[in-house]
């Protein structure tokens, strides 16, 4: 697919990421301006790279014409909280918004991955206004604590270092460290 076509596909997702970041940053600001504790510590986002989209489509056997329906995380938002209790508070804030609709949830807090990875992933529908009118897009929102984010970064780096074939002794040490962290 040519570069210009990819730009036109990804442009609305870039808009969605920018708008969502602004909305979540506004939640932080509103809480702080009113001397309230904000359940959101920080927010970031990204649009998945073309190579990552193509790799995922190949791995999951997704045809090009189904890309926007089946690759749910082209737009990604990460919300970092201080405490685990804040995660459900943030999920409720999202649930109660009129500009976002939750499509699905993957709860890696209740169903911790074998590696020890923990997070709450929400797939939402979000509408952006484009030159051609409104576009309803999907975005993935990952909600986790600072400790969980640190953990996910280390785990991802190790998976990358070992090219997805992490030695059992490293995986075991990683899992044991997460068990210890979870009890702190």
Predicted features, each with a name:
Residues 1-72:
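Charge-rich, low-complexity segments
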Residues 68, 81-181:
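Long beta-strand-rich cores associated with HINT superfamily self-processing modules
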Residues 73-77:
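Short amphipathic alpha-helical segments
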